[in-house]
């Protein structure tokens, strides 16, 4: 009897335990659901946010991801970027989601202070709140227990103010910290974050020296803070020291009078000696200059002196192709309608546009206000004959409408110059990243640029040529934002490709290993450019540890995000403003990932890439046409 009673009690306890566990699990998920409903009830939002008790929380609610592999099945991600949320976040709503790992509310119209219960969620790893209007100070008291699991914290483009709280130093796992475009002030010595790899504090009101552990960050991480100083910005200037009796006397006051007189004599002797030395060096310089001038007048290859009288003959009178090398030093191409010579270029006002893989580019404004771009090449290994042959090829290729027109070139022993048409709208890199506050590159423009660039590369490949240096700064734009590829097929004039900070992020893995470019590596580089247009990120290098440069591997980053099914986090925040382009964006993302396949043989040919982009663009245009037609019909029905 006793054993039967004991078995009954044990069985009852077991079933009660199971029931309690089930109730607890249900309560956890139910509490998550109630917290989300409270948030939706308090924050105005568009109708498309379909949160209600009649739908399954984990499978049907927009923006919600649950960890269904866990028996507790908790909400682990809330992703609502650019959905039109408006208002402040009440406490005890999202802050109740204690299993949350990812929270993305970027690109909405949220304002007010940041609830401390969100920042202190114990499991939170990724927090994206950029491009809202949050305000107030982030004091240490308001962050008593900020989540130590945070890996990415993005509070950029808000109106937060005050000092950067010292509580952030507790973020031992953080690798990305974005605080740019706020109103933070004060010093930044509290940011003792050894684990951080990428930091951006630009466009705040911060002051003081940059801490040692942040000095390897790029300059753009700190610009817009006029009171910040130290590497990578300008050196800090020592402050004025007020006189004090406690300060040591100047050394000269402690010298014996005789020694002081001796020191004066030494100083006078040094000054006289230096003056004589400078005078002697000046005489030597003048002698050398006179000899060099005589040599140039007698037939040397000086850049300034040998003009060949280009002004005496208009460029269009020279016939087809390149002018006779013996007649002129500045060789014009057939379609060049300008009339200037090398002396005009040398006298023109010049502005440095940038340094590329092959040399430095200058904008030169001639006396008749004509603007051209002069690229001064460096480390050319080709002979004069090889150089001229390559120029003929480049001149013919550049007749395609999607290449920057090459107007003329100059070759001498010491100088190699290329003269291009000046493109008024700059480069793709410039409009994407040059001014973060006014980027404004819409989807249609990006597709237009991708289409034209793919046609240019496809045409180049059809002629059996390789570009070898495809990157966003080499995609220049006309007044109508039509893309024109520059630096076409110049790679053959130089040594094997070099990996500079502005190129290595675009280079295919095999180029980095073998230093050999191919049409397949061109496809890879173009794939990186597409990813750049889709994500808004730059595949440039960042300073790393021990003076090594750690590359931001854009393809790898995109793959990792897509693998975690966070596809929405991949796309540029600017693109989320546009409606009904999600399908085209995903198709372009898939195409770009095919282009950046690690195996060269797995990449599509450029002809196929150009055709697929055309298909996506046609789909985009047809959907836009259908949308306009629907809107027009709706307006007509209302008016009737």
Curated annotation (Swiss-Prot):
Question: Where along the chain is composition biased (Polar residues)?
Answer: 621-640
Q: One Pfam family, short name please?
A: LRR_1
**E.C. number(s) listed in UniProt:** 2.7.11.-
Instruction: Look up keyword ATP-binding and say if it applies.
Output: yes
Q: Which organism is it from?
A: Arabidopsis thaliana
Give the annotated active site: 469
Chain intervals for the UniProt region annotation (Disordered): 299-321, 619-640
The record describes its membrane topology as:
Single-pass membrane protein
Listed GO MF terms: ATP binding; protein serine/threonine kinase activity
GO BP annotations listed: positive regulation of secondary growth
Instruction: Tell whether Amino-acid biosynthesis is among the UniProt keywords.
Output: no
Q: What is this protein called?
A: Probable leucine-rich repeat receptor-like protein kinase At5g05160
Organism's domain of life? Eukaryota
The Protein kinase domain, residue ranges? 347-619
- Binding residues annotated for ATP, in chain numbering: 353-361, 375
Q: Which residues carry this modification: Phosphoserine?
A: 349, 427, 518
Which residues form the LRR repeats?
99-120, 123-144, 149-172, 173-194, 195-215
* Family per record: Belongs to the protein kinase superfamily. Ser/Thr protein kinase family.
Q: Which residues carry this modification: Phosphothreonine?
A: 370, 445, 498, 503, 514
Alphabetical UniProt keywords: ATP-binding, Kinase, Leucine-rich repeat, Membrane, Nucleotide-binding, Phosphoprotein, Receptor, Repeat, Serine/threonine-protein kinase, Signal, Transferase, Transmembrane, Transmembrane helix
Q: Which GO terms describe its cellular component?
A: membrane
């Amino acid at each position: 009897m006793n054993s039967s009673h004991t078995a009954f009690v044990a069985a009852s306890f077991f079933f009660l335990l199971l029931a309690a566990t089930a109730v607890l699990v249900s309560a956890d998920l139910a509490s998550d659901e109630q917290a989300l409903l409270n948030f939706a009830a308090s924050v105005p939002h568009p109708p498309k946010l379909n949160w209600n008790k009649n739908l399954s929380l984990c499978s049907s609610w927009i923006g919600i991801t649950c960890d269904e592999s866990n028996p507790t099945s908790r909400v682990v991600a809330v992703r609502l970027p650019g959905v039109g949320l408006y208002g402040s976040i009440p406490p005890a709503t999202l802050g109740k989601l204690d299993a949350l790992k990812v929270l993305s509310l970027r690109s909405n119209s949220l304002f007010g202070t940041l609830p401390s219960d969100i920042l202190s969620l114990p499991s939170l790893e990724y927090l994206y709140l950029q491009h809202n209007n949050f305000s107030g100070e982030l004091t240490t008291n308001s962050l008593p227990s900020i989540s130590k699991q945070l890996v990415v914290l993005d509070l950029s483009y808000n109106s937060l103010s005050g000092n950067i709280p010292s509580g952030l130093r507790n973020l031992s796992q953080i690798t990305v910290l974005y605080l740019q475009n706020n109103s933070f002030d004060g010093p930044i010595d509290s940011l003792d974050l050894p684990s951080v790899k990428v930091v951006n504090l630009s466009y705040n009101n911060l002051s003081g020296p940059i801490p040692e552990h942040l000095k390897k960050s790029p300059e753009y991480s700190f610009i817009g803070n006029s009171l910040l100083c130290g590497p990578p910005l300008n050196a800090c200037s020592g402050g004025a020291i007020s006189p004090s009796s406690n300060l040591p006397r100047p050394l000269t006051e402690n010298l014996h009078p005789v020694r002081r007189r001796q020191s004066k004599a030494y100083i006078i002797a040094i000054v006289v000696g230096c003056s004589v030395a400078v005078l002697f060096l000046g005489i030597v310089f003048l002698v050398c200059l006179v000899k060099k001038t005589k040599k140039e007048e007698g037939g040397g290859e000086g850049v300034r002196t040998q003009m060949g009288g280009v002004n005496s003959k208009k460029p269009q009178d020279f016939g087809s192709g390149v002018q006779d090398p013996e007649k002129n030093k500045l060789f014009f191409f057939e379609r060049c309608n300008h009339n200037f010579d090398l002396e005009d270029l040398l006298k023109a006002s010049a502005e440095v546009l940038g340094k590329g893989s092959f040399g430095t580019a200058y904008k030169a404004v001639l006396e008749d206000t004509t603007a051209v771009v002069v690229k001064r090449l460096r480390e050319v290994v080709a002979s004069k004959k090889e150089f001229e042959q390559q120029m003929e090829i480049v001149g013919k290729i550049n007749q395609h409408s999607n290449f920057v027109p090459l107007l003329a070139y100059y070759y001498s022993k010491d100088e190699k110059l290329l003269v291009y048409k000046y493109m008024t709208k700059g480069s793709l890199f410039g409009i994407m990243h040059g001014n973060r506050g006014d980027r404004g590159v819409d989807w249609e423009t990006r597709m237009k640029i991708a289409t034209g660039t793919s046609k240019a590369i496809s045409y180049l490949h059809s002629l059996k040529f390789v570009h070898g240096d495809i990157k966003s700064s080499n995609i220049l734009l006309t007044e109508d934002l039509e893309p024109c590829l520059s630096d076409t097929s110049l790679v053959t004039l130089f040594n094997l490709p070099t990996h500079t900070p502005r190129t290595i992020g675009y280079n295919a893995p095999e180029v980095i290993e073998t230093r050999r470019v191919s049409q397949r590596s061109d496809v890879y580089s173009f794939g990186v450019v597409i990813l750049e247009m889709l994500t808004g990120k730059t595949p440039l290098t960042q300073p790393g540890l021990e003076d090594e440069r750690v590359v931001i591997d854009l393809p790898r980053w995109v793959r990792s995000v897509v693998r975690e099914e966070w596809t929405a986090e991949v796309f540029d925040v600017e693109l989320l403003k546009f409606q009904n382009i999600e399908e085209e964006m995903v198709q372009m993302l898939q195409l770009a990932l095919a282009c950046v396949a690690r195996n060269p043989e797995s990449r599509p040919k450029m002809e196929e890439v150009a055709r697929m982009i055309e298909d996506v663009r046609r789909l985009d245009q047809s959907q836009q046409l259908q949308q306009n037609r629907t809107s027009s019909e709706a307006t007509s029905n209302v008016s009737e």
